[in-house]
Amino acid sequence: MVTIRLARGGAKKRPFYNIVVADSRNARDGRFIERVGFFNPVARGQEEALRLDLDRVEHWVANGAATTDRVAKLIKDARKAAA
């Protein structure tokens, strides 16, 4: 099953997540099909906290990709910010 989920990066105590489309059987930070954005939960000031390619997300969801709960919330936030 193809899922849209977070892949953790960054340093210890400084998380940074790539939002990726991946096969659910692959490891969390392992092989992925496409990177559709990023999420920086510790962004400060003018730093960009969330960037998401909504066209690609909609493409993958239309083709049967499932989203994790956290990514679904991030997509909702990105749509609200874009409107």
Swiss-Prot record:
The keyword Ribonucleoprotein is annotated on this UniProt entry: yes
Gene Ontology MF terms: structural constituent of ribosome
This protein's UniProt keywords: Ribonucleoprotein, Ribosomal protein
Biological process (GO), any one: translation
A Pfam family that the UniProt record links to this protein: Ribosomal_S16
Keyword flag Ribosomal protein: yes
GO CC field: cytoplasm; small ribosomal subunit
InterPro entries listed in its UniProt record: Ribosomal_bS16, Ribosomal_bS16_CS, Ribosomal_bS16_dom_sf
Family: Belongs to the bacterial ribosomal protein bS16 family.
Protein name: Small ribosomal subunit protein bS16
Organism phylogeny: Bacteria, Pseudomonadati, Pseudomonadota, Gammaproteobacteria, Alteromonadales
Gene assigned in the entry: rpsP
